[in-house]
């Protein structure tokens, strides 16, 4: 993460749950500086990819959310995501809970279109 911090030119404060290995890197950026938010988002995505690469996962107790949803395919293949969407169909058939906050938008839209066409 320190190397990525240098690469992206943004400072990061690493906060962890010492007992279970959860990381909460706090990337510091200036919202008033053009391009800093986009750089911060790219930096965050690289941290998540690195986590998966070394055997971790995209998220822990805080869920996926809009920040991580389009990176779900970094950790899960198409069949895994389809199985997860099938479970969502069972427990949330109208997809009202956490709408557009769990699955990559492209995959979720295709799944929902197929589901609605079948109704």
Task: Give the predicted meaning of each segment.
Residues 1-119:
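Conserved glycine-rich FAD pyrophosphate-binding loop
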């Amino acid at each position: 993460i320190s190397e990525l911090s240098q690469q992206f030119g943004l400072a990061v404060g690493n906060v962890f749950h010492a007992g279970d290995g959860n990381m909460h890197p706090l990337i510091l950026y200036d919202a008033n500086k053009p391009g800093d938010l986009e750089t911060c988002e790219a930096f965050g995505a690289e941290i998540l990819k690195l986590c998966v690469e070394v055997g971790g996962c995209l998220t822990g107790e805080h869920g996926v959310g809009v920040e991580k949803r389009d990176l779900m395919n970094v950790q899960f293949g198409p069949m895994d995501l389809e199985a997860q969407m099938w479970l969502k169909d069972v427990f949330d058939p109208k997809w009202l809970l956490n709408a557009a906050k769990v699955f990559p938008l492209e995959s979720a839209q295709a799944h929902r279109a197929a589901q609605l066409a079948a109704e």
